[in-house]
UniProtKB/Swiss-Prot annotation:
Membership in a protein family: Belongs to the universal ribosomal protein uL14 family.
Biological classification of the source: Bacteria, Bacillati, Cyanobacteriota, Cyanophyceae, Oscillatoriophycideae
Stored NCBIfam families: rplN_bact
GO cellular component: cytosolic large ribosomal subunit
Name of protein: Large ribosomal subunit protein uL14
Length: 122
């Protein structure tokens, strides 16, 4: 569960390393975000000479959370970290690679480009 002020790792090669969530997008008064939800975030740590700079406000989609995710089959998935992928306004990732596993729920929310770039889908 991601809320305001939550720090997330960046799971792509866009140039950012750490994000801080400013707002969870979606339904009206949405306080918490889960896997597949879009957020507005600020870049807190970045790699020099890359397209995304420190203090840039970006849009991202959550791909991993430490909070357990319960599926309809009864299976529970929990990742080791909170991570997001930076996207543009069209919903496509800014980076060309995605690091680490991502959840299958991203495919249901039409983030097929992120799923296809990921090395492992759980």
């Amino acid at each position: 569960m991601i809320q305001q002020q939550t720090y997330l790792n960046v799971a792509d090669n866009s140039g950012a390393r750490k994000l801080m969530c400013l707002r969870v997008l979606g339904t009206g008064n949405c306080r918490y975000g889960g896997i597949g939800d879009e957020i507005i975030a600020v870049v807190k740590d970045a790699i020099p000479n890359m397209p995304v700079k420190k203090s840039d406000v970006v849009k991202a989609v959550i791909v991993r959370t430490r909070h357990p995710l319960r599926r309809a089959s009864g299976m529970t998935i929990r990742f080791d970290d909170n991570a997001a992928v930076i996207i543009n306004n069209d919903g496509n990732p800014k980076g060309t690679r995605v690091f680490g596993p991502v959840a299958r729920e991203l495919r249901d929310k039409n983030y097929t480009k992120i799923v296809s770039l990921a090395p492992e889908v759980l």
